[in-house]
């Protein structure tokens, strides 16, 4: 979790939380968090709530929007499957979601996307491959001067970290 300061307790919104894998990751590394998982799938939210039943400082909500401000917000994997959406429609969806992540985050947010630098022979029509440079530019212009683009790990994806001024 390169977006957070691990030394201090923090609150976090996990948009597209699925069954709560990020909370497992945070717990395994000893992070002290107030966690809210948000997902559009009622089945995933139920599964996550059952997995973490009785756990303090962990809530799971079935929704498409974040309605709570936190120190950080993350979105992992939610921009990959576009089904039959046109590029223009999907780009507008991504931008609206980034606006929401920004509004819901006091200290910063992060997200990942499949990269347009993927091997053409492995690309699928139902997936969206974003231009990392375009999204980096958008984040620098719209959200913060402190933006990092991570495109140096073994997957055909990239991560953008947006840190807000303290």
From Swiss-Prot:
SUPFAM superfamilies: S-adenosyl-L-methionine-dependent methyltransferases. Disruption phenotype: Grows normally in liquid culture, traffics into host (human and mouse) acidified compartments early after phagocytosis, suggesting it no longer arrests phagosome maturation as well as wild-type, impaired growth in mouse macrophages. Decreased synthesis of 2,3-di-O-acyltrehaloses (DAT) and increased synthesis of sulfoglycolipids (SGL). Decreased colonization of mouse lung but not spleen 42 days after infection. Keywords: Lipid biosynthesis, Lipid metabolism, Methyltransferase, Transferase. The keyword tRNA-binding does not apply. Its EC number is 2.1.1.-. One of its GO terms (cellular component) is membrane. One of its GO terms (molecular function) is methyltransferase activity. GO terms for biological process: glycolipid biosynthetic process; methylation; symbiont-mediated suppression of host innate immune response. Belongs to the methyltransferase superfamily. Probably plays a role in host phagosome maturation arrest, as well as a role in the synthesis of acyltrehalose-containing glycolipids. This is Putative methyltransferase Rv1506c. It comes from Mycobacterium tuberculosis (strain ATCC 25618 / H37Rv).
